[in-house]
């Protein structure tokens, strides 16, 4: 998530400054299969790994053999003397360590250069600059046994400066011209050359429907309890839709599109359609699912809390402090940014960014009580106390503000339910069951 956030924030900054941004997404051919064992041992030694651990890893790769199963039978065993183990939980760490050692002399400060496993992104302000850096990376990696994929590597040009002349040069790996694209799927999130998120919104909805169809045997089965269907949806389908939404500069039209898709899923789970004229709130209460828009707010605030608690010199904090260039703002309304969306979320819920600091909450009891007015934790002790409290209070009509309450586990900066600024004990407790 951090890499996606960095890339979107950099694109927002360049768009505000009206400066062109050039990106190349590099893919390594059979990255795990091309790692020389000698380079692996040297990288471990250079990083100061203990000798005992190095010997343990060497034992894992010593005298490794495999066979190939075909229609004609199984082949004889043959040794494997190169590459990392496929499927091993240790392999991604070893590969990252090797790549870091091989490129430590040419790496630049993020976000100018971003590495995530075998996915490499290089950023530049011109094609010529990008070509120079790409050639440097090619020499550094291909001289050690790796190979940059000519077919899967792609180039994207973000033309935020409409008055700048287009360069005639091409972005190349050696003699091969890298194809230019208008959007690229980076770590599961669709990045567009105009900095917008429409492509990613549509992709998330499609991914959610694909997951929903795979589970339709359960979700559409009339014999399965409706509450179990809701729990299955919250566990398997909704996280697929919400992936990457923390980094969206979301607009109301995007929220509407995602909300409509979710309601279609929930209605089909209940065996209902819009022609049955059942309100959305009744469907949600029956299934036990809160509006996905509120979950998007929760995820944004949770991620905002993680970012704010990071050290000031971390890359996710430095990208927000990039110096603005002195440019003349163009005509029209400025484009919405992630920070503007977060600021609006905080203002609508009377929250302060200082609440993200753990030490502030520990020292300021008033701030802690205020924040707890917006966050519901699903602790066993609190659940028991709330049940006792409900039994002692006269049952009232359902409150629309309580419909967003949920019982999922939350981290500190989660906003699972956004309620008015009312003390906890003075809130009206409804008889309707909590749903999330």
Task: Tell where the protein language model's regions lie, with residue ranges.
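Conserved pre-catalytic core of RNA-dependent polymerases
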Residues: 1-93
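Charged catalytic carboxylate motif
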Residues: 2, 6, 98, 133
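Short linear motifs embedded in intrinsically disordered, charge-biased segments
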Residues: 51-54, 68-88, 92, 99, ...
